Swiss-Prot record:
It comes from Ethmostigmus rubripes. Belongs to the scoloptoxin-22 family. Coiled coil: none annotated. Residues 75-127 have a biased composition (Basic and acidic residues). Residues 1-24 form the signal peptide. This is U-scoloptoxin(22)-Er1a. The keyword Signal applies. It comes from the Eukaryota.
Amino acid sequence: MAVILKHLAIILLVFVIEIKMGQGSQIERRSSGVTHEMLSSISKPEKRFAFEDTVANERSPQITFSTDWGQRKRSVNEDREAAERERSPQMKRSEHEEQLMAKDEMKRFQEERNPSSDDKIAIDKRSPRYLPTII
């Protein structure tokens, strides 16, 4: 089973790489399965990738390759920080407030499940139609 999943993952990876490189039309003409040509194209990426500022591609001409991973990581962190600053005050609850809310929900749930003795009818939340059950 693991071998089959491994082969399927390799096939999927090859198809994704082929589509990303703009050779999706060639995939349709090939028979299914991993060929030697496909595996050799994966093992030699220097022939397939052009590390330039802009790669001319008929599908999306604005693809850029950057080798400065530090800059990319900084921009991702800046985006996350900006998103944190833009969050509404309701979403910025502290962990303590969230724990209190969870405790309140648990109390309400327990009260619904175990009503007091003076209640004659309780709603059974497990039933899909919320049919009242007599205690």
